């Protein structure tokens, strides 16, 4: 009865909260204009990634350990955003503790970035050996239901690399992307994402294209922690601080009969490989209570991050949408923000 009510409720709300789809898939074909001089720097950087992809991960990681301190002095804005987010989510941490997490976070990010070229330049056997999986039994359990799966994946440094794992093991995957504005970069990133097949939709295509793909037998990748503004969001606690949280996940589940599997992407610094973390799929989801469903999404996201803080992209503006009267915590030049978030 609850499922029938939820389906009816979400169906009535879909026109309000989910943009119409145009099925605008990313065009991954190579264009001659990509060879224009304005892209030469991009091609040089891709060449560097190509060379790095053939250097053992242990050697690359050792280099990252050496230069992370120097790099932190050139990433002032990212550092401040990271410290602000950590203060908002973990108010009991001292400034020294937050700076330590930031340094670890930057080191992990650098190791992942320098390994980007592997998905483009290395062979299948190499890629297969670069993964370890925690919780594979939860994936098998979800697949046994015969229903489409939405992998709920928070923003982690290794999110693209570990997302490839799902396609690599034979799952038909779809996801959405937001263009960076750099055609060569987008072509490179989506060439990696589509290495083992699947579909990548432009974000402006709307969520209905994902729902249609799920009904057609695909599985989807969903980022639950995005802040896309007050529209299609409710304010629900995230690590104790109210956040404008997306309401589309329970709607997708209701309209496509999909199940939700928490998914986290890690770079394992000890083993120099990528770790896919899977957890048990949501039971009785969605319910008739939209806010409770969004809270469950945030709670699952928190659980994935705790103990793996250095893997999470803390420099993103997860709390940029404020309630009326609230101070914008990302006002880096605001003395109140400086005192509250960037000092002990």
Which sequence ranges carry the predicted segments?
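Catalytic core of membrane glycerolipid acyltransferases/transacylases, capturing the structured
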Residues: 145-204, 227, 231-234
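Active-site metal-coordination segments of metallo-dependent hydrolases
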Residues: 80, 179-183, 242-246
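Hydrophobic alpha-helical segments typical of transmembrane helices
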Residues: 47, 82-85, 188-189, 248, ...
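Non-catalytic C-terminal accessory region of glycerolipid acyltransferases
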Residues: 21-34, 100-103, 140-143, 168, ...
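Membrane-anchoring hydrophobic helices of lipid-metabolizing enzymes
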Residues: 18-153, 197, 341-344
